[in-house]
Amino acid sequence: MAILPIRIVGDPVLHEPTETVSESPAELSELIADMYDTMDAANGVGLAANQVGIPLRLFVYDCPDVDETGKPFRRRGCVVNPVLETSERPETMPDPDDDVEGCLSVPGEQFPTGRAEWAKVTGTDADGNAVEIEGRDFFARMLQHEVGHLDGFLYVDMLVGRNARAAKKTIKRAGWGVPGLSWVPGTVEDPFGHDD
């Protein structure tokens, strides 16, 4: 298995809708394993195929959640050809503390992002079996974030007001927003500080 370079905002593969997956589970197995390795090395909670330069409609996740009693646990899996359904997205400004979101393709940065409280994704898993996953709060945020990647946009594309202006300045200051930039987890310091 391999850790793959993660494309940075501005790379064309991140800004175009991905292609429907027609490959068999066997043909996808190495890519999916590499995506898990890459996500784990980056301490991510989700990773879309186009973030590693592959314009296919699939993502992997390893995301914290809470059960109905409030007990924390992790949900890990893969969804191929996901279809997203959500509750209504709030029209108010996102909370600067509760709605902060980050992205491995905008390394080290976080901005308040408005998301629906509930989301459900249907598709198939890594073995080709039908799958339906749903969640609330942070897990719902992750589902919306990853499907957004597959639809050709990043979370910074949906920011509003001062958050959009701040993201634009940050991207410009970092020299991002151009094709060909990437980073390889494990070869540089964790941009989100998980190495500390």
Curated annotation (Swiss-Prot):
InterPro entries given in the database record: Peptide_deformylase (IPR023635), Peptide_deformylase_sf (IPR036821)
Co-factor requirement: Fe(2+)
HAMAP family linked to this entry: Pep_deformylase
Organism: Rhodococcus opacus (strain B4)
BP-aspect Gene Ontology terms: co-translational protein modification; translation
Alphabetized Gene3D superfamilies for the sequence: Peptide deformylase
EC class (word): hydrolase
Cofactor binding annotation: Binds 1 Fe(2+) ion.
Domain of life: Bacteria
Catalytic activity annotation: N-terminal N-formyl-L-methionyl-[peptide] + H2O = N-terminal L-methionyl-[peptide] + formate
GO molecular function, one term: metal ion binding
Name the record gives this protein: Peptide deformylase
Residues in coiled coil: none
Known EC number: 3.5.1.88
Positions annotated to bind Fe cation: C103, H145, H149
Functional note: Removes the formyl group from the N-terminal Met of newly synthesized proteins. Requires at least a dipeptide for an efficient rate of reaction. N-terminal L-methionine is a prerequisite for activity but the enzyme has broad specificity at other positions.
Any one Pfam family match given in the protein's UniProt record, by short name: Pep_deformylase
Active-site residue list: E146
Keywords, ordered alphabetically: Hydrolase, Iron, Metal-binding, Protein biosynthesis
Assigned protein family: Belongs to the polypeptide deformylase family.
